[in-house]
Amino acid sequence: MLFRGLSLWMLFLASCLSALALPAAEDDGSVKVFKRAKKHSTKQEGPSYAPYYVDCPSDNIVESLSSNEIPSAESEYLSTRSTITNTAMKDFLRNANLPGLNADTLSGSEGPSIGIALSGGGLRAMILGSGALSAMDARHDNHTVLTGLLQASDYLVGTDGSAWTVGGIALNNFSTINDFSKLWAFNHPLMYPKSAIVFNAHFYSSIMNEVAEKANAGFNISLSDYWGRVISRTLGDTTYGFPNVSLSSITSQEWYRNANFPYPIITFATQNYGEDISNVNTTFFEASPNVFGTFDHGINSFIPTEYLGTTLNNGASSNGSCVINYDNFGFMMGASSTYFNKIMRNFNDSSTKNGRIIQQYLKGNFSENGQQIISIPNPFQGVESANSDAANNLGSSSSLNLVDTFLTGEKIPLWPLLQKGRDVDVIVAVDNGDDSEWLWPNGNSLVQTYERVVAAQAAGNTNVKGFPYVPSQQSFVSLHFNDRPVFFGCDGRNTTAGNHTVTRDTPPLVIYLPNVPYNYFTNISTDRTYYTEDMIQQLLTNGLISSTVDNDTYFGQCFACAVVKRTLERNNITASPECQQCYYNYCWSGLYDDSAANDDIVYNPTCRLGEGI
């Protein structure tokens, strides 16, 4: 009787899934839905993934900025946060215990502004980046040489897997990594979350039903809707995956209202269907709990994240209605990691009828070509400044095509931190990328950002500060800059911005922290979607050890010297002898080594502390 009942139940679920079949994908890769939601449709009872409509708060919801401005909500957040960062900066500098470094003089309104950028790279980058953040968090149980850096920072930026870190801790009351990691559900492949067939059958039907709610409400759907439903179930709500929780809802949390932690940002790029993606020509978009938009190409426009998904023309809705809950937390995490759409489309679970149905449905309705692209309503259609982005037709197109920034080659999301209005002095660039043959970082992400900055400056982009000079990708490996921390841009007068007096507009100093194997071989494929508990702990530990050079006191002191370098330069203060020695040891001297003899160098390191320590 048990097996007969089970079979009938599974057949019922399968029939439900079959009833959800939707029209085939159009050329833009999304599934078109012809049933439109009514203007005054109301919020549904109970948790629902479907967006819905409300009255718009004003006639125009696009915030157009002047050059060097930042969105008003972000400015207010940072103003509230300044008292916290000033105190935290003093604590961080004092903890360095470095002679000649006056914490009171080097903090306050003229003190450093720090941005932390975590690279993408799937679950590998999420876990390793989380380990690095734990080393910087004053709430962490064990003191490290970077303790308090997180509290002293203004920005925290993620993309792809690191967007899951940034978004996940932000949604969970900016929890500690120790608490956040207890919520993870990675011990089975994300598409096969349990060993029990019955559970997985229900899992597949739930995902299909949830996305169908969005389609039935009149909104186009994409592979990222399905992928977002999967990834959100691993970040704190394993049963339902936050179906009616939005990214913008984070603004109501107490930590956010009090600006207790860095301003969180996740990034996206653009790609047109049928075209190759280029890190130089793509437009980078960003989302925070407050706003979604871009500084690129002189567009300088943002909308409240809360109203993402609204069809606008020149900032106004034609019928006065705005969309709510399109910025579903899971969808935004999925949209920032469209690299994984291929895994979503190509997964194969034939152990359940529901698994076979969803597998056939995704392959039948979403083309492999352009599968990494998602199309959303373009909130900047008709906005005058958007016409400057002719390559993406941003001013005239009704759709905005987004992809994973990871796919541009700029795997460390530095671009938001290079905007002049943000006044970032130093960027902590945590590189958990997989660019080398053996899946280790090789400096390529910094080279890609440098090339993009040079192209942007040549095109007359006045928003971007510029960037430090960096060595070639070949030199990164041949000179071992990818297996130890390196400071780039130590001389603020010698950057792509040219020789000038150092000000807040000077390009930031970049502290490069590559993934190095200390206790574990962390060169794991980005495509891997499950980790054992032991692997998670090993990666968290390696992320902490790698970012602190095995908690080396001298490195911590030199890190503090790097943090205050722009402040010293702006105020014409001579660095202490101790800091000068640090700059000699850690700053890139401008040395290159592109000799042909290095063409075949393969970076394949060993564990520095022994595997499993």
Curated annotation (Swiss-Prot):
GO terms for molecular function: lysophospholipase activity; phospholipase A2 activity. InterPro entries: Acyl_Trfase/lysoPLipase (IPR016035), LysoPLipase_cat_dom (IPR002642). Gene3D superfamilies: Cytosolic phospholipase A2 catalytic domain. Pfam families: PLA2_B. One of its GO terms (biological process) is glycerophospholipid catabolic process. Its EC number is 3.1.1.5. Its main location: secreted. It comes from the Eukaryota. It catalyses: a 1-acyl-sn-glycero-3-phosphocholine + H2O = sn-glycerol 3-phosphocholine + a fatty acid + H(+). Keywords: Glycoprotein, Hydrolase, Lipid degradation, Lipid metabolism, Secreted, Signal. GO terms for cellular component: cytosol; endoplasmic reticulum; extracellular region; nucleus. CDD domains: cPLA2_Fungal_PLB. SMART domains: PLAc (SM00022). Glycans are attached at N142, N173, N220, N244, N281, N319, N348, N365, N494, N499, N523, N551, N572. It is found in: Secreted. Residues 1-21 form the signal peptide. Residues 55-593 form the PLA2c domain. Catalyzes the release of fatty acids from lysophospholipids. Required for survival under high osmolarity, for normal osmotic stress-induced gene expression, and for nutrient-mediated repression of sexual differentiation. Belongs to the lysophospholipase family. This is Lysophospholipase 1. The gene is plb1.
